Amino acid sequence: MMARALVQSTNILPSVAGERAGQFNGSRKDQRTVRMLCNVKCCSSRLNNFAGLRGCNALDTLLVKSGETLHSKVAAATFVRRPRGCRFVPKAMFERFTEKAIKVIMLAQEEARRLGHNFVGTEQILLGLIGEGTGIAAKVLKSMGINLKDARVEVEKIIGRGSGFIAVEIPFTPRAKRVLELSLEEARQLGHNYIGSEHLLLGLLREGEGVAARVLENLGADPTNIRTQVIRMVGESSEAVGASVGGGTSGLKMPTLEEYGTNLTKLAEEGKLDPVVGRQAQIERVTQILGRRTKNNPCLIGEPGVGKTAIAEGLAQRIANGDVPETIEGKKVITLDMGLLVAGTKYRGEFEERLKKLMEEIKQSDEIILFIDEVHTLIGAGAAEGAIDAANILKPALARGELQCIGATTLDEYRKHIEKDPALERRFQPVKVPEPSVDETIQILKGLRERYEIHHKLHYTDEAIEAAAKLSHQYISDRFLPDKAIDLIDEAGSRVRLRHAQLPEEARELEKELRQITKEKNEAVRGQDFEKAGELRDREMDLKAQISALIDKNKEKSKAESEAGDAAGPIVTEADIQHIVSSWTGIPVEKVSTDESDRLLKMEETLHTRVIGQDEAVKAISRAIRRARVGLKNPNRPIASFIFSGPTGVGKSELAKSLATYYFGSEEAMIRLDMSEFMERHTVSKLIGSPPGYVGYTEGGQLTEAVRRRPYTVVLFDEIEKAHPDVFNMMLQILEDGRLTDSKGRTVDFKNTLLIMTSNVGSSVIEKGGRRIGFDLDFDEKDSSYNRIKSLVTEELKQYFRPEFLNRLSEMIVFRQLTKLEVKEIADIMLKEVFVRLKNKEIELQVTERFRDRVVDEGYNPSYGARPLRRAIMRLLEDSMAEKMLAGEIKEGDSVIVDVDSDGNVTVLNGTSGAPSDSAPEPILV
């Protein structure tokens, strides 16, 4: 290898001569031209048994001047072996290429392969510039009407396709190398320390000859016009280029900042940023900190969605308007994309190199204010084993005031990351950003209204704006203003626009028919049935005309409606905002419709179809639901909280289930917690989640997670007296403030839940007092007896539960014992459930009055409520039916009558014989 290098070194003499000629002529050309571009011809001679290098070489005189040796010069170049005419470009030049410029060169090589050429010429570089697609050069060429397809055709016309062997490494032609040299010169003239796709295009235009120039000429592009457009897009005029060539620094560009940052001040000047309403105090404080001599780095700290980024945008808008003190006047706010900065840094040192370049550009400019959103990502960014992360690289500059940086992060992330690094924390001055009030949010929404109206092409009413702020504050508890209110008006606008953009039902049907006919027509053409295809085509044209007419009619109707309403397009009303809140949370906040009003007024009747008796409890629950639905309940407390006390089996849990079924949709809509599972002290943590370090910490609490997912529901704490006393302490804040903090520190909102606690405390008192309540007593005497029992039960509850717990409850309801008549009604409900199960098996069941009385007699027990009734039905009916079905006496499609004979035995009759028709009740269908 060294021998080959020695032989090849003799071929660099033309470059050496050029170097010396440049020195004698007083040229400013860099003495490193040899390093930047060489044309080496591989010598066909071979040296065998080479013993070593001589101490002196023809190049040594030149190389010593630049502090280099032949060894280092040869090592700096990358050689590619070729039979003859081997060309190469040293790596040092490509180090200055941007990623887009490197992509252009790679695409040029791909184009050469595609055309079968064993070289990369100016025409391939031109194709690469067009194909890159995103750079300045590609945009300029596209604006001139030059596309890749036409350019390829022109190239093939001029030079044709090759058919030779294509190697892995394709060399450059001398003219292509000249283009690369000229692109370097163009970059220097523009004051850039990099070579981008725009410089390659300028070099291509400056070369002026070759296939690429002919292609541009054939495509009708004016090279002078292209050059002007490129320089304009780069941000330089002809005069500025001349000034920078003359030694000025005004042409200095900041490629790293442009690549990894966004200029907020420029966006503000162009009016592309949303207006910032309020936040005057925070912007003033940020301005004060930026005016400091050292440690002039404000850090905006606040909850997610309170408007931290908006403060940086507000500062950029003030700078653009000139409404800032002279300390920061004329500066640019540039937001840095940390993800983009880290992306693609595969090798060690790449990230640090990017960051150092960025810092150098900021120091040179002295007019940059860097904004880093999510500033905690600095810590650990780019850090590999043995590497330094971004925070440690930035620390010295942040402390000395060389770098003005605005950070933004949440309270949690600030505590977790920045406070753990005191050296970084002291360099940032914290600026607290509180959540705005509802009134401030309304002002913010009114400021943003115009932008959203333009985007959605509709109009927002003042009522909708106010409803968005108020309803989001009341019902969406896990997010912060103004973010959640802005999301509400945005989604409501999207919903209304989609609703108005929908085609009429008739047009949708015609479109469906049109798709079918088009499909049939294509099949007919494939089957060469052209006569049928012609008929279908005529039908297709008719349908298209009909659909077009319907769409025009719909547009005219919408236009007339908007003109009648004096509004630009559809209108977003308060009802639309309410609908979005309901769809987000599941809480009905829309105005009560007529149907729902009737349902709420008849709620007692509805609940009584499943819960027999217990009028006091049913009325209390119905009142609470009505109060909540019309919006009269206390917004800071749950809908209601009850203790249902009474003997077992009288319908305490059943009432909660029936409420969940009839009003909340299904029994599963209820959150049921069996408090007998929380008898021990350590099990209490299951409600809110295990503490850190314990099993189940990541899963969340049984109560808190369920309520977070379904905030509008019934929460049933069954058998509350079985729970450990610590449970009651935890429930105090739920009952009073409607909130509970889980093990992860998140606040769960209970303001839209109905809390029901069942208890058997006082059942012995009810049993003793209940015996005196007979069937023949007057209503007044019944009520006085019930009131006496209620007072006794309340006293017993006070002995068992702490006063601060009982005092927070909405109501303590004592359930009565069931009478025999009520048990008979319950028997009908339970029998109906059996009928439904058999109906699913296609067996029709009827029971006689005698059998019903037998069930009630066996199942009635005042002390145990309705549960003995279920056992009686299971024993008398279900067991008898199961035996007959297994014996094959009852099959699908049979009609079965269950009766009791004179001896009191249950008889199951298949068919209608053996039982009088008047005694057999009609099957109860559900």
UniProtKB/Swiss-Prot annotation:
Start and end residues of each UVR domain: 511-546
Repeat 2: annotated span: 172-236
Keyword flag rRNA-binding: no
Region ranges (Repeat 1): 97-162
Cellular compartments per GO CC: chloroplast
Function text: May interact with a ClpP-like protease involved in degradation of denatured proteins in the chloroplast.
Protein name: ATP-dependent Clp protease ATP-binding subunit ClpA homolog CD4A, chloroplastic
Annotated organism of origin: Solanum lycopersicum
Gene behind the chain: CD4A
